[in-house]
């Protein structure tokens, strides 16, 4: 069995109940009565299945273990392992695939009948990633990622937490000093407001 490294269902459920509470408060402000809201961990997880749930409900397709791979799009979720780290691809259209091939100097893949359209790429994705990896092996992670971004090829660097929270990174900006003790660092919510949220003890006389 495989377990998520964080309590994902709890986090999803907390977002669902927050939305329900805010909707109730808004309804009350508009003159309607509030409501009782109930959220379960299981239903929160089911509601987050997105395209996997749709694949089953439309075609009774039960997904197999496939890691980060997208079941209906390729190369989407495939990883390129390079000097300096790895990149995960999220190529969702033929034009993006063409740009990817051009950057890697492998334009012949674009016209290869095995990869001619998305359906073909999904069918032959194990062959495709071997071809892409072979074409990319002479590149470094950061230089290739810069090329992808400049040409509109969706991709991202795979980072460990040391790199996530490195100085100057978006992750570093998400870290705040806990105001109560002043010594603990925590990750703030990814929302910026025009005022500071009141913390415990702010109004203690």
Describe the function of each predicted region.
Residues 1-86:
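Active-site-adjacent "lid/gating" segments in soluble enzymes
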Residues 47-205:
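Acyl-CoA thioester-binding alpha/beta core of soluble enzymes
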């Amino acid at each position: 069995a495989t377990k998520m490294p964080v309590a994902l269902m709890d986090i999803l459920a907390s977002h669902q109940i927050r939305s329900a509470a805010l909707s109730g408060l808004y309804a009350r402000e508009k003159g309607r009565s509030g409501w009782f809201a109930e959220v379960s961990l299981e239903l929160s997880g089911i509601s987050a299945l997105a395209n996997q749930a749709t694949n089953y409900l439309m075609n009774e397709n039960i997904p197999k273990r496939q890691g980060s791979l997208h079941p209906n799009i390729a190369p989407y979720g495939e990883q390129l392992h390079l000097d300096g780290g790895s990149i995960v691809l999220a190529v969702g259209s033929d034009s993006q695939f063409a740009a990817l091939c051009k950057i890697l100097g492998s334009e012949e893949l674009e016209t290869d009948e095995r990869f001619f359209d998305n359906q073909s790429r999904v069918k032959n994705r194990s062959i495709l990633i071997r071809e892409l990896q072979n074409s990319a092996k002479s590149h470094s992670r950061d230089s290739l990622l810069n090329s992808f971004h400049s040409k509109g090829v969706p991709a991202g660097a795979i980072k460990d937490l040391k790199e996530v929270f490195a100085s100057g990174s978006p992750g570093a900006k998400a870290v705040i000093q806990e105001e109560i003790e002043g010594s603990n660092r925590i990750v703030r919510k990814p929302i910026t407001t025009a005022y500071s949220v009141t913390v415990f003890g702010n109004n203690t006389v």
